[in-house]
Amino acid sequence: MALLYRRMSMLLNIILAYIFLCAICVQGSVKQEWAEIGKNVSLECASENEAVAWKLGNQTINKNHTRYKIRTEPLKSNDDGSENNDSQDFIKYKNVLALLDVNIKDSGNYTCTAQTGQNHSTEFQVRPYLPSKVLQSTPDRIKRKIKQDVMLYCLIEMYPQNETTNRNLKWLKDGSQFEFLDTFSSISKLNDTHLNFTLEFTEVYKKENGTYKCTVFDDTGLEITSKEITLFVMEVPQVSIDFAKAVGANKIYLNWTVNDGNDPIQKFFITLQEAGTPTFTYHKDFINGSHTSYILDHFKPNTTYFLRIVGKNSIGNGQPTQYPQGITTLSYDPIFIPKVETTGSTASTITIGWNPPPPDLIDYIQYYELIVSESGEVPKVIEEAIYQQNSRNLPYMFDKLKTATDYEFRVRACSDLTKTCGPWSENVNGTTMDGVATKPTNLSIQCHHDNVTRGNSIAINWDVPKTPNGKVVSYLIHLLGNPMSTVDREMWGPKIRRIDEPHHKTLYESVSPNTNYTVTVSAITRHKKNGEPATGSCLMPVSTPDAIGRTMWSKVNLDSKYVLKLYLPKISERNGPICCYRLYLVRINNDNKELPDPEKLNIATYQEVHSDNVTRSSAYIAEMISSKYFRPEIFLGDEKRFSENNDIIRDNDEICRKCLEGTPFLRKPEIIHIPPQGSLSNSDSELPILSEKDNLIKGANLTEHALKILESKLRDKRNAVTSDENPILSAVNPNVPLHDSSRDVFDGEIDINSNYTGFLEIIVRDRNNALMAYSKYFDIITPATEAEPIQSLNNMDYYLSIGVKAGAVLLGVILVFIVLWVFHHKKTKNELQGEDTLTLRDSLSRALFGRRNHNHSHFITSGNHKGFDAGPIHRLDLENAYKNRHKDTDYGFLREYEMLPNRFSDRTTKNSDLKENACKNRYPDIKAYDQTRVKLAVINGLQTTDYINANFVIGYKERKKFICAQGPMESTIDDFWRMIWEQHLEIIVMLTNLEEYNKAKCAKYWPEKVFDTKQFGDILVKFAQERKTGDYIERTLNVSKNKANVGEEEDRRQITQYHYLTWKDFMAPEHPHGIIKFIRQINSVYSLQRGPILVHCSAGVGRTGTLVALDSLIQQLEEEDSVSIYNTVCDLRHQRNFLVQSLKQYIFLYRALLDTGTFGNTDICIDTMASAIESLKRKPNEGKCKLEVEFEKLLATADEISKSCSVGENEENNMKNRSQEIIPYDRNRVILTPLPMRENSTYINASFIEGYDNSETFIIAQDPLENTIGDFWRMISEQSVTTLVMISEIGDGPRKCPRYWADDEVQYDHILVKYVHSESCPYYTRREFYVTNCKIDDTLKVTQFQYNGWPTVDGEVPEVCRGIIELVDQAYNHYKNNKNSGCRSPLTVHCSLGTDRSSIFVAMCILVQHLRLEKCVDICATTRKLRSQRTGLINSYAQYEFLHRAIINYSDLHHIAESTLD
């Protein structure tokens, strides 16, 4: 029994456990489904069999029920997420129960039960709900009077409603919850889905004003829905006077603020009390409730009043508020009438200004009303403007005005308090400047070729622009030719002209043929800007060549036969393609006296020309060659054509005959009827022979005696007539047919006893016509004289003859060079400031080399030699060209310079030589060529008044015109300004100082100080402003001319003068980059509209010519990658004498061009500095970055000026140098005052270094040694150094600096050094010393800045730049503020060797000045200049890169770019 009991108990436990687990499973499987009332919801379950039953509670749902839809769908296994362990798929079913239009009654448990199998079931709990929503509420804005009751409500739809509803419904005020609101709120349930939520106040007061919001929250506290209702509690208004001010003798301005009590103000009432009276009275004006300010009037002047204000709304009147102070009216009304004037204008704007109001009226004027009207009989208002009063009284600019139009302006002052304005000012007239004109109308371009003179011209005509936009003063004509030649494609021009109004046409002569010309014409108004261009074009037809070179020929013996060998020149086809060449031989009849021009000579056949009875000289075509088969050497008289290939000859002749279509192939001679012998008269039968017998002798190599014999024989031959019937038809060779058209070109055997000449005919095809050009006659030649045999290679006599001749020539050359060498070493090395000297070597070189320059045939030369031609030098060859000429103490330069022409056959100086004009020349040998001189307007009919020592000089490709002039003298300043005015000059380049070498070089032709004015004749000059840079001064001069006639407009102009400061007479700048930058600055502001550039120095030839030449050569180098220095200077000297006056200046051209060719433009502007330097430092995939390449060029560039270090290298001074590699140059070393009884006491290892302004601003020194500390302090005292920079560490060792000061004071010879105090700063230590020269009892205060942050490793630079920047700022500012006036007082900096660290500091000081004053830097040029002044400066790429990095940081730190934009 016990066992049975235990088993029954165990079974019962298992059953109970199963039931419990099943209950848990059932409970866990119930799914909750929220169903929105009014929407549909679907319940899904899966089963293995199709038969399932759906129940709601215990009620089975019928499939036919209208509110339910039941469907079953088969689906694959695992779709419900269960695992399928069988190997093959089996089918399950998805059962869906859809509840339609859910309502509250649909709430309950739904069960899906399978009717077969294990009766699995799935239970769903459906809970209907409605989302909360406010259906209705109190109006959005509700008003209640104070102490009235009010109820706010919200009708809310929501389901289910339960115990949490009260907690989830809240009223908020102004967005916040308040506990008192729960006290006044209530909830009333209307039905299962609607409730009313109310907020009720029995009495409302001002504090109940606000916005209330009924809100439904969820259980987490998030807002579900809400509705805002604003409650306004109305009360009487409250008004307070904020501001009161008397604005007139009987007016007071009031301004107030108001609380309207949530009800619009209807009226304001003002009560007032006059001081001294007991009661307040109402003001006559009732003020509308919309006002917050008002002007009260009808007060007594200069009387004090007390004011009150009351506001009224629908609730009632508020309490009166009184302004605390009494208001006293003015004794007069404040009236200000501005005095207006125009202060500036442009083409579309006019700026006006007026005087500021007096101080006592400023408070009553807040703005101005301005009116601009277009002038006329009835002024037309263009614009009205409001301009606020400002403390700076800034002017006002009207824009968008018409150009060159008169306007009238009026201004009146207005008060913002009274809303009234004072009287208008008087009308002021202003005129806008001229604008940009539209294009000229009716532009006509005609290309014309004159067949007689063969001249080409282009006629251009135009009319005024349709809309000039001002007064047109001139027209700019731009003519550019595009050659049609396929061989020579060099562009013609551009040629630029300026034609003054009222002329509307111009003529370009001597233009090139075979060119398509494009012309642009633009009008220039007084605004100096080009107008819209009108463009046209025309085609100049082809023409024959301009020149046919000399044809050389000689007689040769070919196979025992006499023939003529011609050397044909290659002729340019620029003017048109040459299709054929024809060679004519002329057999000269010795009775002829002269030949007609080749084009007039009758042409016969070979047979006719060689007839024995021909009595006049005739020509025949000996050879005809097309351009296709052109060859430079031709044999005549060999009875052969130029080629033995018949196909070539046929093709050649076909080309030439086609070229000659429409033109007779031969010019046939007239038929000559010869009378019987004896009756032939000279006048009918003879042509005169050549008139110049010398040419005949020379051409035939005959003596006078031989010539007489030859003429006698030829006359005998002519008298022997071989045919009685027709002597003309007799021929030398009777076997040749008398005439055959196929033999019109026949190179027959020549008559050895006849004189021959010839000429070359060039044929150019122009559409339907053939154009011919003819060479001059060849030199006369007689084959009968000894001919030059065509030598065989085995002819030893020939080679022996050549060897003897060559040896003689070589011996002569050796002798000449020996003579040159002797005279070269005897010549004085120190030339007198570059003046030209003519030595024996000069004479010999001129005799040897002549002046071989094909482009300068007008040079005055000796003999028949042509000028020297150096030829163009490619950019890459500039360095070698400079070095080759630099050898042997600049012998190459000297030889080339001495070949420059000083005189020209086509240049005269008659006007300069006139007695009346001699006093106008500063130097008697510097004259102005008559052909290119600047002519002034004649005064009172005196012709000599048109003279000034100045010439027009054309720049590269005629793109720029200069006027090169001598510096004005006191007696010529008026003429100088007349020239500036008449030539419309706007840019002056001055290259001299007023005094040099204690001699006057130029008179001062501008006023003394800025804002001063000075009269020069009719010209009034005002010194407007001045800007100084390191190399030059830029001055702005405003110039006007006295009116010639009453009513004439006064013409005002602005002239800019660029005064270069550091170029001495006869000399050349030591560093080329300064003058190159100067030229670039001038070019950046130059335009054709600004007229020619006036350049002058003292004489107007040396420095002036060098600058003009350099400007042209730089342009040529940039465009062509090569330069022709010699030819350029020759061309310039042809326009003004002696341009580039000294050898040093000529050498400088090479140096400057080498600099430009090597480095280009290295200037970096501040606005692009960061990106430009980043681009330089950006490394390509392979190779080095641009900055590294630039630095390597910098290291490779040798200093062209030899600099000795002899003093520092003396054995006695070696112990004073830390390194024998770093020695100061003699030329700029610091020289100490010698000490008595002590030798070599003047030396210290220190160098003067030029600063930004090219003065010796700095001293760079090595760290003093123990034995040179006294010398160091002597240098400080003698140079009056007040600022000392130390960039080294104190200590012992080769790279350390000894402590060269004591804690108190120490004396070195006569120098006493007293230490005062020190101050530690973040990047440096500052120390003060007193240095006393005991000899002269002079004490100097010296401030030392010791930099603390430099890396101790040699060659390293600081990682960050801030420390150096701070040092530069502090030290350089101290130097500027404390340097001793009247002496150099240079800033002295020292490091170990006086190289790397010191050079970085000095470079940064220079670059900072450059950046601040010019808004750009040239680190490359600054580095090159520094390196030329002391060995070892900026000697590594790391240092060079640091400068670039540091200057960017300096600009960013000091916001220099931003200040530039401002």
UniProtKB/Swiss-Prot annotation:
GO terms for biological process: axon guidance; cell adhesion; defasciculation of motor neuron axon; dendrite morphogenesis; fasciculation of sensory neuron axon; motor neuron axon guidance; neuron projection development; signal transduction. One of its GO terms (molecular function) is protein tyrosine phosphatase activity. Its main location: membrane. The chain crosses the membrane at residues 806-823. Its EC number is 3.1.3.48. It comes from the Eukaryota. This is Tyrosine-protein phosphatase 69D. It comes from Drosophila melanogaster. The lineage of its organism: Eukaryota, Metazoa, Ecdysozoa, Arthropoda, Hexapoda. The gene is Ptp69D.
